[in-house]
């Protein structure tokens, strides 16, 4: 079972058993999937490179989190974890919609 992954040229996760190769890839490549600001809230979706599924069938390798300086309920909130790049984009967009609706409803 692999815990470390890198992305191939098509942004598909592939297992990486060489820790040096993995570390170099993580340092040399842009891991940001999407990043948006809504007011002071940052919505960030990134490739983690490490399986966060806790033993799930498919590795959870991408994560959307929010960050806020104003102490809002969105500060350091994990909005979702995903298995693939396209799922991460969809999850990011849903997080943006959710936060936009929340802020617009205040």
Describe each PLM feature range.
Residues 83-102:
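A short, charged, amphipathic alpha-helix used as a generic interaction element across diverse proteins
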Residues 1-62:
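Short N-terminal "domain-start" leader segments
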Residues 9, 69, 86:
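Short, ordered coil/turn segments that flank beta-strands lining enzyme active or ligand-binding pockets
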Residues 11-16, 76-83:
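Short, exposed beta-strand "edge-strand" segments with a Pro/Gly-rich flavor and a Y/T-containing core
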Residues 1, 48-78, 94, 101:
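Short aromatic-glycine-(Arg/Gly/Cys) micro-motifs in beta-strand/loop hairpins
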């Amino acid at each position: 079972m692999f815990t470390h992954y890198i992305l191939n040229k098509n942004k598909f996760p592939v297992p990486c058993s060489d820790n040096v190769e993995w570390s170099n890839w993580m340092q040399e490549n842009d891991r940001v999937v999407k990043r948006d600001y809504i007011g002071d809230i940052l919505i960030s979706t990134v490739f983690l490179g490490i399986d966060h599924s806790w033993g799930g069938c498919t590795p959870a390798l991408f994560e959307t989190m929010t960050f806020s300086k104003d102490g809002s309920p969105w500060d350091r909130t994990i909005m979702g974890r995903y298995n693939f790049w396209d799922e991460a984009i969809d999850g990011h967009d849903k997080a943006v919609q959710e936060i936009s609706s929340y802020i617009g409803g205040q």
